[in-house]
Amino acid sequence: MVDGMQRANQVINLTPAEVADGLREGRLLLVDVREPNEIAVERYPEAVVVPLSHFDPADIPDPQGKQVVFACRSGRRSVTASLAAQDQGYPYNRHLAGGILAWKAAGLPTETG
Protein backbone atom coordinates (compact mmCIF):
# COMPACT_ATOMS: atom_id res chain seq x y z
CA MET A 1 0.00 0.00 0.00
CA VAL A 2 1.46 3.34 -1.07
CA ASP A 3 0.24 6.51 0.70
CA GLY A 4 -3.00 4.76 1.63
CA MET A 5 -3.82 4.14 -2.02
CA GLN A 6 -4.10 0.65 -3.37
CA ARG A 7 -5.94 -0.50 -6.44
CA ALA A 8 -8.63 -2.95 -5.36
CA ASN A 9 -9.02 -4.29 -8.88
CA GLN A 10 -7.03 -7.33 -9.84
CA VAL A 11 -6.72 -9.34 -13.03
CA ILE A 12 -6.52 -13.12 -12.98
CA ASN A 13 -4.25 -14.75 -15.56
CA LEU A 14 -5.71 -17.73 -17.42
CA THR A 15 -3.63 -20.04 -19.57
CA PRO A 16 -4.58 -20.82 -23.15
CA ALA A 17 -5.57 -24.35 -22.06
CA GLU A 18 -7.84 -22.98 -19.31
CA VAL A 19 -9.52 -20.62 -21.76
CA ALA A 20 -9.91 -23.30 -24.44
CA ASP A 21 -11.44 -25.69 -21.90
CA GLY A 22 -13.78 -22.99 -20.59
CA LEU A 23 -14.95 -22.12 -24.10
CA ARG A 24 -15.48 -25.77 -24.98
CA GLU A 25 -17.46 -26.32 -21.78
CA GLY A 26 -19.54 -23.16 -22.30
CA ARG A 27 -18.26 -21.48 -19.12
CA LEU A 28 -16.44 -18.53 -20.71
CA LEU A 29 -17.18 -15.63 -23.04
CA LEU A 30 -14.00 -14.55 -24.82
CA VAL A 31 -13.78 -10.83 -25.61
CA ASP A 32 -11.06 -9.84 -28.08
CA VAL A 33 -9.98 -6.22 -27.55
CA ARG A 34 -7.64 -6.04 -30.55
CA GLU A 35 -8.31 -3.60 -33.37
CA PRO A 36 -10.32 -4.48 -36.52
CA ASN A 37 -7.21 -4.50 -38.74
CA GLU A 38 -5.63 -7.15 -36.49
CA ILE A 39 -8.77 -9.26 -36.38
CA ALA A 40 -9.07 -9.10 -40.18
CA VAL A 41 -5.75 -10.96 -40.37
CA GLU A 42 -6.25 -13.52 -37.60
CA ARG A 43 -8.81 -14.05 -34.87
CA TYR A 44 -9.85 -16.30 -32.04
CA PRO A 45 -12.71 -18.65 -32.90
CA GLU A 46 -15.87 -17.77 -30.96
CA ALA A 47 -14.61 -14.41 -29.66
CA VAL A 48 -16.72 -11.27 -29.37
CA VAL A 49 -14.85 -8.19 -30.61
CA VAL A 50 -14.83 -4.98 -28.53
CA PRO A 51 -11.75 -2.96 -29.62
CA LEU A 52 -9.82 -1.24 -26.86
CA SER A 53 -9.57 1.99 -28.91
CA HIS A 54 -13.22 2.71 -28.11
CA PHE A 55 -13.75 0.29 -25.27
CA ASP A 56 -17.00 0.39 -23.34
CA PRO A 57 -17.80 -2.66 -21.21
CA ALA A 58 -21.49 -1.99 -21.85
CA ASP A 59 -20.82 -3.12 -25.45
CA ILE A 60 -20.01 -6.63 -24.24
CA PRO A 61 -23.00 -8.91 -24.84
CA ASP A 62 -24.74 -10.30 -21.77
CA PRO A 63 -22.51 -13.22 -20.75
CA GLN A 64 -25.60 -15.16 -19.56
CA GLY A 65 -23.84 -16.71 -16.60
CA LYS A 66 -20.51 -17.16 -18.35
CA GLN A 67 -17.27 -15.68 -17.05
CA VAL A 68 -15.92 -12.90 -19.29
CA VAL A 69 -12.28 -13.32 -20.32
CA PHE A 70 -10.42 -10.61 -22.23
CA ALA A 71 -7.84 -11.41 -24.90
CA CYS A 72 -5.52 -9.47 -27.19
CA ARG A 73 -2.20 -10.05 -28.98
CA SER A 74 0.17 -10.43 -26.03
CA GLY A 75 -1.82 -9.86 -22.85
CA ARG A 76 -1.24 -6.16 -22.20
CA ARG A 77 -4.40 -4.67 -23.69
CA SER A 78 -6.55 -7.41 -22.16
CA VAL A 79 -5.33 -6.38 -18.69
CA THR A 80 -6.14 -2.75 -19.52
CA ALA A 81 -9.65 -3.73 -20.63
CA SER A 82 -10.25 -5.80 -17.51
CA LEU A 83 -9.17 -2.97 -15.22
CA ALA A 84 -11.30 -0.46 -17.17
CA ALA A 85 -14.35 -2.73 -16.89
CA GLN A 86 -13.77 -3.19 -13.17
CA ASP A 87 -13.42 0.59 -12.74
CA GLN A 88 -16.93 0.86 -14.21
CA GLY A 89 -18.35 -1.74 -11.82
CA TYR A 90 -18.23 -4.85 -14.00
CA PRO A 91 -16.93 -8.10 -12.42
CA TYR A 92 -14.73 -8.90 -15.43
CA ASN A 93 -11.40 -9.77 -13.84
CA ARG A 94 -9.90 -12.45 -16.10
CA HIS A 95 -7.69 -12.35 -19.15
CA LEU A 96 -5.81 -14.71 -21.44
CA ALA A 97 -2.18 -14.40 -20.35
CA GLY A 98 0.08 -14.10 -23.37
CA GLY A 99 -2.77 -13.34 -25.77
CA ILE A 100 -3.07 -14.83 -29.22
CA LEU A 101 0.70 -15.40 -29.28
CA ALA A 102 0.41 -17.82 -26.35
CA TRP A 103 -2.81 -19.27 -27.79
CA LYS A 104 -1.03 -20.19 -31.03
CA ALA A 105 2.10 -21.39 -29.20
CA ALA A 106 -0.18 -23.81 -27.32
CA GLY A 107 -1.32 -25.22 -30.67
CA LEU A 108 -4.85 -23.83 -30.42
CA PRO A 109 -6.76 -22.86 -33.57
CA THR A 110 -7.25 -19.40 -35.03
CA GLU A 111 -9.27 -18.21 -37.99
CA THR A 112 -7.65 -16.22 -40.78
CA GLY A 113 -8.86 -13.95 -43.55
Region annotations inferred by a language model:
Residues 1-29, 35-69, 76-113:
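Rhodanese-like catalytic fold shared by cysteine-dependent sulfurtransferases
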